[in-house]
Amino acid sequence: MSYIKKLRARLDSGEISAVELTKEYLAKIKEQDKRINSIITLCEAEALKEAEDADAIISAGKQGLLTGIPILHKDLFCTKGIRTTAASKMLDNFVAPYDSTVTKNCKDQGMVTLGKLNMDEFAMGSTNEYSYYGAVSNPWDLERVPGGSSGGSAAAVAAGFAPISTGSDTGGSVRQPASFCGLTAMKPSYGSTSRFGMVAFASSFDQAGIFGHYAEDVAIMLDAIAGECEFDSTCVGVKQNHFTQDLEKDISSKVIGVDESLIKDLPAQIQEAVSKTLDNFKKLGAEIKSVKVPDLKEALSTYYIITPAEAAANLARYDGIRYGYRNPEARDLDELYRKSRTDGFGAEVKRRIMIGNYVLASSQYDSYYNKAQQLRKVMTDQINQIFTQVDAIFMPASPSEAFKKGDKLDPVSAYLSDIYTIPANISGLPAIAFPIGFANNLPVGGQLMAKAFNDNILTQMVVQYQKHYGIEEFILQQARI
């Protein structure tokens, strides 16, 4: 079950050329994205040139699995010669002089970059309402949010603008939008993909991820972008087929841990979807075992102390001097810094910078930042202890279906959207979200989390689940291939 393999067959048979396929997707984006606002920069000329190159490779019989396959990139991955904005006024005119490792790996395998995707500014947000380029709409219901921060990545794939897209996940930013848009998306183990050329939010949490309809496509793409990178000291080498090595194996020996206390207070329709999903895993031979997950509210508090601190440090570089927005009315250097940052950053980014600077202040450091780091270590140890008993932990990907735009503009209520996804980021563990049912006629997702670098177990489990139970009901008509 793979859109990538379907497109590969069409390209190899000559049914369609890479240029024709690219033109189809570009036409659909031009016609339909006005309603969704998922694209910041459309790379039409570049895409057609890459498609021509792909056709030449195919004609020579030297193609790989991904040659000529279209892709869209979240607009925080640097792309040489194409602007990279991070959805911020601060970087509105920034054109990167180099490619991120993620985008370079895609180019090296002959993929066609269609464009750069909308997102919450600097990846800070859970709704994609915090973008300098406007909010993104959910293709399932245009009045609702697609989730965030990778909302454009999710909305574009759900709308059929590309078969696959990249995203980033700092606290759930690929998994929560996947849940809201009926997609499969994965945050791999911290260090399995390079962060070089990815605009930084919180460096010890950030990780590149992939969106697709099918888990097999997500696994194929993660194999494509993963691996060692000399420019990222936190990136470790994983073997070439790390994510796809076990996709054909059954899951009859797997043990899934479930904390019932995390499910009992969910809306009834989501509880029903969770129950049905666990029953389906049992039918595939997996064992369901009761476990106790660390307090999620403590995880949320820990996350919203450490990540703003890291963000404050990472965003200190944007001062209007070397690159980025520069206020034209500043009369001296101090005023240039102050006015450029005041005008260049949006409200949510400024909020998190202020929180970060507060918790890092010498008078508050021990009370907040130091304690949060200690708690992070304790929670990571507690979660890893659970994996001595189980292969994976199942949780919802979000406490609700997609909500209406403007419903959660209060920061605290918006932050609670990440409550189920944050534990994987705190502990650096892999986690995959996949569609499991509907609530109020909108898709909802489940989530599996595994031990560090056991990513292959997650892709195996979800591929087998989708092979037996299908996901056609979660694919909108306009996105079908």
From Swiss-Prot:
The keyword Ribosomal protein does not apply. Keywords: ATP-binding, Ligase, Nucleotide-binding, Protein biosynthesis. Its EC number is 6.3.5.7. Disulfide bonds: none annotated. The active site is at K74 (charge relay system), S149 (charge relay system), S173 (acyl-ester intermediate). InterPro entries: Amidase (IPR000120), Amidase_CS (IPR020556), Amidase_dom (IPR023631), AS_sf (IPR036928), GatA (IPR004412). It catalyses: L-glutamyl-tRNA(Gln) + L-glutamine + ATP + H2O = L-glutaminyl-tRNA(Gln) + L-glutamate + ADP + phosphate + H(+). GO terms for molecular function: ATP binding; glutaminyl-tRNA synthase (glutamine-hydrolyzing) activity. GO terms for cellular component: glutamyl-tRNA(Gln) amidotransferase complex. GO terms for biological process: translation. Heterotrimer of A, B and C subunits. Allows the formation of correctly charged Gln-tRNA(Gln) through the transamidation of misacylated Glu-tRNA(Gln) in organisms which lack glutaminyl-tRNA synthetase. The reaction takes place in the presence of glutamine and ATP through an activated gamma-phospho-Glu-tRNA(Gln). Belongs to the amidase family. GatA subfamily. NCBIfam families: gatA. This is Glutamyl-tRNA(Gln) amidotransferase subunit A. The lineage of its organism: Bacteria, Pseudomonadati, Pseudomonadota, Gammaproteobacteria, Thiotrichales.
